A protein has these predicted regions:
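Class I SAM-dependent methyltransferase SAM/SAH-binding core
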Residues: 49-50, 55-100
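Conserved beta-strand signature within the Rossmann-like core of class I S-adenosyl-L-methionine
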Residues: 138-145
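A conserved beta-strand element that flanks and buttresses the S-adenosyl-L-methionine
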Residues: 111
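A short glycine-rich, Lys/Arg-flanked "PGG" loop and its adjoining helix->strand segment in the class I
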Residues: 125-137
Length: 243
């Protein structure tokens, strides 16, 4: 199992807060109609728990299983769950990775944000098969599309800039094609003092297998749709696979 996030985990909440503000509303709109009587809702790749909170709010009666393989991220996730009485009652945190995740016998829905591209196409096909065997007809698998449907060069760009106390944090990200459907993304966090002096940089890279919702639907043998707006506002693309 590869831990993609421990190197930069200290900064993750800065990204997650913004991410959930834009992706939370469309995710909520998809989940609100889900019948949760069939089994738990599964979140694969729970991160620090921001999306978990969205799921719990949209489905106030649902049992939720959250899998997060990174120990550093899982520590923040467990802390978030433990301090909220409602989450503490309904959410089970596990350390499983998508490729070999133990699954309950039945599920009502699945959420995968920031995960699908870490899997190769054969790994995804195997996962879709296991999930489909546990979902009822009409149940959704909600997947974040990430906006990269095929390999391409993405010059480094500053994607976020936030100030905390006397320091400003910049997040830079870029990518380039490697082999087949894969890209290598490189991220750099810069920590700057008030005078603009860089006091620290933390860089990391990972391989991402590109896809679009049509490809995921073909892999899974399911129907699909894209969510591109919520409440009349453009949002990051979300794919919904329906058994």
């Amino acid at each position: 199992m590869i831990d993609y996030y421990s190197t930069s985990a200290e900064f993750y909440e800065l990204v997650a807060t913004r991410h959930t503000a834009s992706s939370g509303p469309p995710l909520s709109s998809v989940l609100r109609g889900v019948d949760t009587s069939h089994g738990p809702v599964l979140e694969i790749g729970g991160g620090t728990g921001r999306v978990t909170e969205v799921i719990a709010s949209a489905l106030p009666q649902a049992e939720i299983i959250v899998a997060e393989p990174s120990a550093t991220m899982r520590a923040m996730l467990t802390s978030r769950v433990a301090r909220d009485p409602d989450l503490r009652r309904r959410v089970t945190v596990t350390d499983g990775a998508a490729q070999d995740l133990p699954l309950p016998d039945t599920l009502s829905a699945v959420v995968m944000f920031g995960v699908a591209g870490h899997l190769t196409a054969p790994e995804r096909v195997a996962l879709w098969k296991r999930l489909a065997a546990r979902l009822p007809d009409g149940a959704p698998i909600v997947v974040e599309l990430m906006g990269v449907s095929s390999p391409r060069v993405i010059p480094p760009v500053m994607s976020l800039r936030e100030t905390i106390g006397r320091q400003t944090y910049e997040w830079w990200i870029g990518g380039e094609p490697t082999e087949g459907d894969a890209m290598r993304f490189t991220t750099t966090w810069k920590v700057l003092r008030e005078d603009g002096r860089t006091v620290r940089e933390v860089s990391d890279s990972y391989v991402w297998h590109t896809f679009d919702v049509a490809r995921l639907a073909a892999e899974a043998g399911m129907t699909s749709r894209r969510i591109t707006e919520a409440g009349g506002r453009a949002v990051p693309e979300i794919g919904v696979l329906v058994k």
